[in-house]
UniProtKB/Swiss-Prot annotation:
Gene symbol of the encoding locus: CAD6
EC number: 1.1.1.195
Matches recorded under PANTHER family: ALDEHYDE REDUCTASE
Chain positions recorded as NADP(+) binding sites: 53, 171, 192-197, 215-220, 255, 279, 302-304
A Gene Ontology biological process term: lignin biosynthetic process
Cofactor(s) named in the record: Zn(2+)
Residue sites binding Zn(2+) 2 per the record: C104, C107, C110, C118
The protein, known as: Probable cinnamyl alcohol dehydrogenase 6
Family indicated by similarity: Belongs to the zinc-containing alcohol dehydrogenase family.
């Protein structure tokens, strides 16, 4: 177990699991959280989902990791302390904390409720707070956050399965709304049936949208069609299937982070269709300009959502009974879970039971 030196006055001891280097191996870690500010809430972490980006950051695959690194940005918890100027929450409220915990609040993106695109947005973990301290994420017993960057969790939404909505859920909801891929007159393709993709199917169906899953894994067709309710399933490596579906989709949301060709996906789009990229692939894409010009097709990207939209998404999920398919794990299983995640061996999201299993790992 490790303890940070140079702890600031009025800080509060915290406990979690951290990686110390790019091996990505997590182990118990004692550190400090700042004192709760006037407009901040302290949140007792109950559950935290494991996002694929956690794995990327643990192993420094994006070359920006700051160690020690405590991951976790799919946080569900309970307000345990409030600052004297907090008006949004009360003690005991159930809340969610997603990928960002602050932004500049003055730029055009912030003024338009798109804090997620603020160039000075502060990540929930692996980011640097205004006071110069490193942010640690939700694989820990508590977290401090400005009330503006937490969302209310309705009592009708199961807490443990709500955790993945804070990243995977909003990542799918936002582009569907922004690019107009909602309603019975729309047909959306979702590439990849994993943590993001499976939630995307459920949001699409709740919007009344026709949805087709595109996957290289033939064995996922039954889950996509029978369990999640997708209207169609295409095997991306089956040339006949892909050819038959050409020009049928208004939009496609590509969740795959592994390197792959997007040219066949562009072929699935109708004229004026949009391919929206969510997966951060290591290698750049190689595409023909003619594949876009002939049909006025476009490629876009999307990343999570602003705080207002995240609350809207959570409320929509509660209203429509949308939840993630999860596997609940204990804190001491996290390294095994990371190994399984790297192999794609999860259906479809791991969630750590922080409140019931973290304390037992402290020696």
């Amino acid at each position: 177990m490790e303890r940070l030196s140079g702890e600031k006055e009025q800080s509060v001891e915290a406990f979690g699991w951290a990686a110390r280097d790019s091996s990505g191996h997590l182990s118990p870690f004692v550190f400090s959280r700042r004192k709760t500010g006037e407009e901040e809430v302290r949140v007792k972490v109950l559950y935290c989902g494991i996002c694929h980006s956690d794995l990327h950051c643990l192993k420094n695959e994006w070359h920006s990791s700051i160690y020690p690194l405590v991951p976790g940005h799919e946080i569900i918890g309970e307000v345990s302390e409030i600052g004297n100027k907090v008006s949004k929450f009360n003690l005991g409220d159930k809340v969610g904390v997603g990928c960002i915990v602050d932004s500049c609040r003055t730029c055009e993106s912030c003024r338009e409720d798109q804090e997620n695109y603020c160039t000075k947005a502060i990540a929930t973990y692996n980011g640097v707070h205004h006071d110069g301290t490193i942010n640690y994420g939700g694989y820990s017993d508590h977290i401090v956050v400005d009330e503006r960057y937490a969302v209310k969790i309705p009592h009708t939404l199961p807490l443990v399965s709500a955790a993945p909505l804070l990243c995977a859920g909003i990542s799918m909801y936002s582009p569907m709304k922004y690019f107009g891929l909602t309603g019975p007159d729309k047909h959306v393709g979702i590439v990849g049936l994993g943590g993001l993709g499976h939630i995307g199917v459920r949001f699409a169906k709740a919007f009344g949208t026709k949805v087709t899953v595109v996957s290289s894994t033939t064995g996922k067709s039954k889950d996509a069609l029978d369990t999640l309710g997708a209207d169609g399933f295409l095997v991306s490596t089956d040339e006949d299937q892909m050819k038959a579906a050409m020009g049928t989709m208004d939009g496609i949301i590509d969740t795959v982070s592994a390197s792959h060709s997007i040219s066949p996906l562009i072929g699935l789009l109708k004229s004026n269709g949009k391919l929206v990229l969510l997966g951060a692939t290591e290698k750049p894409f190689d595409i023909s300009a003619f594949s876009l010009i002939l049909g006025r097709k476009s490629i876009a990207g999307s990343g999570i959502g602003g705080m207002q939209e995240t609350q809207e998404m959570i409320d929509f999920a509660a209203e429509h009974g949308i939840k993630a398919e999860i596997e609940i794990i204990s804190m001491d299983y996290v390294n095994t879970a990371m190994d399984r995640l790297a192999k794609g061996d999860v259906r479809y999201r791991f969630v750590i039971d922080i409140s019931n299993t973290l304390a037992a790992t402290r020696s």
